[in-house]
């Protein structure tokens, strides 16, 4: 992920809203993952995979994007049919198309809902790929299972967060992990 400042912002958002979610839902201690979202620990974790992000906008007349990302208007337009890219698992690569979340655009309650959706999506993604393995892990080693969910959130929620000054981009991201 090229923009480390944005990624750190996303990690901090994940930690904040996971903490609120865990408290609000009175989650069991072994299901809580907010404390895992420490920027320094994540940055120093050897071998931790970073997501690949392709930034797109639905607006073909977005002057800001052309000026800043296409070498001062010198670029190409790539048209993609993203209707199938709602999220899925294929050949050990997870991919999702997600709208960016700009700072101060959503209320805390809305962000808690979004992080809960990411938490749920993570659990579903793993259970959907190898149900027997992950059900056994959830039963016998719940903390290990939620670590996988934490990695999912790190891959698919954190890269969505952007600073308000970029709101004009109206950006969505294809995230590969």
Question: Model-found features: residue ranges?
Answer:
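Partner-binding and oligomerization surfaces adjacent to conserved cores of proteins
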Residues: 1-177
